[in-house]
């Protein structure tokens, strides 16, 4: 279960960035896949999770780490999402990976909507 700071950070970030993520249309597929890849890396690299969530580390430094790792390759929206997340407070370092994964799911649903297959996704999820 996530702590209060993590729940708030996840919810506020997703609420604020949802319109921008939705507006990426079919690029949301790429963004979602990038976010799932980042989730996997975070889940397997505790040091990176800590580096990106350390409250004593300046946000600009955290964003610098992100740009070094994914900046040139990632979709600009992926970098914007990650930059927003590293600027927020987390109850535990591991919670940022959960938030990244939540964004990945959101991105895939926005892609499904842009591709006109939202109903099919809903049916598939119920089966």
Residues covered by each model-derived region:
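Elongated, mostly alpha-helical coiled-coil "stalk/stator" tethers of large membrane protein machines
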Residues: 1-127
């Amino acid at each position: 279960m996530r702590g209060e700071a993590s729940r708030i950070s996840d919810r506020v970030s997703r609420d604020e960035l949802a319109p921008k993520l939705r507006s990426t249309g079919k690029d949301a597929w790429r963004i979602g896949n990038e976010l799932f890849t980042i989730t996997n890396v975070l889940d397997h690299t505790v040091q990176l999770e800590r580096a990106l969530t350390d409250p004593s580390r300046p946000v600009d430094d955290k964003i610098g780490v992100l740009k070094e790792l994914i900046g040139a390759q990632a979709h600009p929206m992926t970098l914007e999402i990650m930059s927003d997340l590293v600027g927020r407070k987390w109850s535990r370092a591991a919670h940022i990976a959960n938030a990244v994964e939540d964004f990945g799911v959101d991105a895939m649903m926005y892609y499904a909507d842009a591709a006109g297959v939202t109903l099919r996704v809903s049916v598939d999820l119920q089966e």
